């Protein structure tokens, strides 16, 4: 399957819903810390991305050809009015906390793990916040948001590639993606799927496997599905793991299963709901 995907190059598979459509957070997630979920060919682990043991369990003996990730980098996202960025509809408290977002320490530890993997392609968003622990690079990616909101007009990603600086233009106005269907964010650092797809086409055409150590709301996973790459996703928050699973299920129409017992996510969700009504 991986070889076929590489031969198909930049083709993109359409989903059953818009690629940036994200389910709402749930109060009582099915996922618990340590769970590994199987989503078609992909793997999702609820675990610590700074733990080499956890990453090895996620990879299950496979090697990551590409690392594409967006670590937390310890910056406040709340503006003076008490809103998150430019979205007047999204109040603080909509989001589950991001583990490690108080400092850049988690990002730095994760970068040390990434260095042990020797992936052919490494793309790390927010690399400008911890450039002192990254190797010098001639190839930074600039995401030009064409932004009229309160968030930054652009974001930077460090890469290990030898090419020149590249610019990706995609409108994302604060919390609202203005260029297409206006889907609201569920995760405060959520990025458009088109951004990951563009990076896959530009830098990862020969990469069959993609690792994201901070999967968040699951945009990287949806890009892997669309571009026929095998995704290995790590996310510490059980709440966001549930979002990722439901997002992938909505996009594909398929069922995720828990590796430990083979039960589907929907079966376990029904079990949870039954317990809560007892």
Predicted regions and their residues:
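Class I S-adenosyl-L-methionine-dependent methyltransferase catalytic core
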Residues: 10-211, 215-278
